[in-house]
Amino acid sequence: PELSQHTAADVAATFSGLLQQHGITVEAEPAAHAAPQGANPIASVSSATLSEILAFMLRHSDNTLAEEFGRLTALARSENNSPEGATKAVRTVLGNLKIDINGLTMADCSGLSPGSQLTVRTLAAVQQRNLTVGDGAPAAEGLSVAGLVGSARKRYTSDDVAGLLRVKTGSLDT
């Protein structure tokens, strides 16, 4: 299905059509209106915050969410909502933060596409910023914790290190 840009109107039109298919007369066209004063909601939607979703993405190495965050970055930077727009936007943001991106090659935002490369220097600079700048805390806190949680839960499980290391899991190609 195509992504709706006007979900309330689309739902109302679909509902109206279904009512008519079942012999119920609908006398007016769906239209947007403010709820009457004192009206009680009939439904609501809630979600985790973007910070919580980011932490989940990092902790569980969720590649689909990584791509989504790339696309959100692209849209926020007025780039195309595409893999190319996402990687361009991420590189621009990193550059604006004065993070060394020499040697960074992004074929996508998840790292799944062939050709993506990340230097230790770039990764360390991103994590350093996350640990020292207030708005980076969710990214730092979202990393897997060795021996405890996330994709590193079954790694480094000895008492000497379990719970002490926040790590980004994945594979490195040398």
Regions found by a protein language model. Give the residues of each.
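Short, highly charged low-complexity linear segments
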Residues: R129, G150-R153
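Short, Gly/Ser/Thr-enriched beta-strand-loop segments that form substrate-interacting elements
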Residues: N40-S46, K154-T174
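Short clusters of hydrophobic/aromatic residues that line enzyme substrate/ligand-binding pockets
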Residues: M106, L143, L165
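Active/binding-pocket-proximal capping segment
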Residues: G136-G150
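A small/polar active-site loop signature that marks catalytic segments
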Residues: P1-A137
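A generic short-segment signal for beta-strand/edge and adjacent turn/coil regions
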Residues: A35-P36, V93, G147-S151, D159-L164
